[in-house]
């Protein structure tokens, strides 16, 4: 394959990424405060709402909250476009919704937020307070998700969402090591840079070998299932027009296996949880 352009993982503002990380730790404290506010007020159910990539990102929090939560905790992952046409019978004025929009203009999320607010539902948004969604939610219920330097990836959204969700669990007595989680992740941004640097040669080799494959399969599970979908759909299909097939490890042997043949790359996302 002739190389027409060289793309490097580390070709971004690394100092800016680290600065964003430091700022994000402070922003995470705001998410913790919002979780405390919700816990103090009380709630009957937690809804995690996204569309496209944000829906994929929130999937890991749904997994964690259901894994560590008590039997009375109700957590639902909802797709904004689907909720707009079908609603959800368990959503009441005592429910709380966490959503996200880096642009602040996602049409489906904006429509849903307006409807939810009219129902008296509390909505917390990871978005700019100046955007349409932020204005609909209210500045006091917004935490800015977008990075100031345009560097990095979904890990920033993951971090903020987890600060909120895991704090709710902590307040229920279900996640006692919340403070340890915050302490151990405060410097993770440097580690993320180191991982990128170490993976650069491998990434280049994989890209050269598989870039022109007719389509590629991605298998994931557990906390990584949402990331499996996001990488396949948002990174490869949407951004690079690559044909992909994402499948859960639980379902792989019930159909998709029959399509594995010579020339079709299969990528396995190997997590650290019980579904690995």
Segments (PLM) and residue ranges:
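Conserved N-terminal alpha-helical segment that immediately precedes and caps sugar-phosphate-binding
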Residues: 1-276
């Amino acid at each position: 394959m002739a190389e027409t352009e060289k793309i490097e993982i580390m070709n971004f503002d690394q100092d800016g990424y680290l600065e964003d990380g430091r700022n994000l730790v402070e922003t995470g404290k705001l998410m913790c405060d919002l979780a405390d506010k919700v816990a103090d007020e009380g709630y009957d159910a937690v809804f995690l709402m996204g569309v496209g990539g944000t829906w994929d990102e929130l999937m890991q929090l749904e997994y964690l909250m259901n894994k560590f939560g008590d039997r009375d905790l109700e957590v639902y992952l909802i797709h904004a476009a689907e909720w707009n046409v079908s609603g959800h019978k368990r959503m009441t004025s005592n429910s709380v919704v966490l959503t996200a929009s880096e642009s602040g203009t996602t049409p489906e999320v904006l429509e849903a937020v307006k409807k939810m607010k009219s129902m008296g539902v509390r909505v917390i948004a990871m978005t700019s307070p100046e955007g349409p969604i932020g204005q609909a939610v209210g500045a006091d219920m917004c935490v800015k998700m977008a990075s100031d330097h345009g560097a990095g990836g979904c890990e920033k959204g993951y971090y903020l969402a987890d600060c909120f969700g895991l704090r709710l669990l902590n307040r229920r007595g279900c996640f006692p090591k919340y403070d340890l989680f915050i302490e151990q992740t405060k410097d993770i941004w440097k580690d993320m840079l180191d991982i990128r640097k170490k993976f650069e040669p491998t990434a280049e080799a994989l890209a050269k070998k598989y870039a022109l494959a007719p389509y590629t399969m991605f298998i994931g599970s557990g906390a990584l299932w949402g990331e499996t979908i996001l990488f396949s759909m948002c990174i490869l299909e949407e951004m690079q027009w690559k044909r992909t097939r994402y499948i859960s490890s639980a379902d792989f042997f019930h159909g998709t296996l029959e399509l594995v043949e010579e020339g079709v790359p299969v990528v396995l996302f190997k997590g650290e949880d019980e579904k690995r």
